[in-house]
Amino acid sequence: ALTIRALRTLAARAYATADGIGGGRKGVVHVNLPFRKPLEPIPVETDHADAIDDAGFDYAGAFTVMTGGATIPTVQQMQTLLALLERHERGIIVCGPKSLGENFVSAVAQLSQRTGYPIFADPTSDVRFGGHVQDTAVIGGYDTFLNAPPTWEAPDVVLRFGGVPTSNVLNSYLERIDVKHRVQVSADGVW
């Protein structure tokens, strides 16, 4: 039998997991609660209804505390990425849903300009439109040419930011190309 305290803790953990606290992916949480057949109350000698008042309802603090913080790459990770980008001229940047902060669009545009890598921008990425498209290679209509057999070499590097792109054509292309290096950057750490 679950105690009320255990149920509160379970509810707090389920909420924290669904909210992505602790660096996990935000999303649906499935909770299994064991019930006896036929899902109706059965009197048990050890049940004490008056004990419910002492079950912690007057306790205002949290039974379970989960926290999350900003994920910031280390200096070594940034140096490794920089060395990788300097070694390879052919690459693409894929921006999926859920941009990574208010400065992301300008930062990824600068990255594209410095590396020469075009940006394949998902419609939900916030990168497809804006002032940066005047001087940055932002490609939004990639579905029109990625389905055809490629007449170009596969990129050496694929930098992916955000969630999985919504385009099946782009996802199929990314799966079938032989890439030396794939780098995934996402706010929730999921790849």
Positions of the model-derived regions?
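Glycine-rich, anion-gripping cofactor-binding loops and their flanking helix/strand elements
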Residues: 95-183
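Glycine-rich beta-alpha junction loops
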Residues: 33-39, 97-99, 125, 189
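Flexible, glycine/proline-enriched loop segments at strand-loop-helix junctions
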Residues: 2-6, 67-70, 94-97, 157-160
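Active-site glycine- and acidic-residue-rich loops that bind
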Residues: 5-11, 22, 97-103
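Conformationally flexible catalytic loops at phosphate/diphosphate-handling active centers
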Residues: 13, 17-87
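Hard-cation-handling environments
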Residues: 90
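Short, acidic/small-residue loops that bind anionic groups at enzyme active sites
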Residues: 1, 182-189
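Well-ordered alpha-helical segments embedded in enzymatic catalytic cores
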Residues: 10-13, 76-80, 141-145, 169
